[in-house]
Amino acid sequence: LKRELEPAALSGRVILLPLVNPEGFYHGSKQTIPADGQNLNRMFPGKSDGTFSSQLARVLEETLYPEADFLMDLHGGDVNEALTPLIFFPTAVPEKLATQSALAAAALSVPYRVASTSKNGLYSWAAQCGIPALLVERGERGLWSKEEVTACKHNVYEMMEHLGML
C-alpha cells in the first residue's frame, strides 16, 4: 500500500503503522505482547509507568492520536481465531462521533458491522479522545490470504474515498 500511494494525489495525509507488535507477530501470537503477555488492544488508555504493553499504548496515544483526523485499525485473526470479515465501530461516544464512525463503517465493503461499546482498544480509545475510528477484522489462524490482503487494501481506498482524500 505504501508503494502504491501517491502523496501528491491525496488530499490529506495517510499514516501507516504496518506492525505495532512485531515481537508477537514473529512469535506467532499477535494478540499478546511477549514481553508481558498483555493484549495491547486492551491496554488503552496507556500508562507511562505501566507494563510494556501499557507504555506502548501510551506512546501510540501521544504520537498517533494528535496527528489523526480518523483512525482505521486493521486486524487479522490470531492463531486461535477464524474470522468472518467484520467492522467494529464505536457507539459509547458523543452522537456526532458515533455517526461519523458508523457512516465510515457503512462505506466499506465488509459484510458485517458491530456497534461496539468497547473503550480500551486503539480505535475505541481514539474515539473516547474525540477521533472517529473503526476496526476492521479479517483473516484467520494467524494468516491472511492474498485475497484478504487485496480486500483490506480495497477497504483503505474506500475509506480514503469516503473521507474525500482521493
Give the label of every model feature segment:
Residues 1-166:
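Structured catalytic-domain cores with a bias toward divalent-metal coordination
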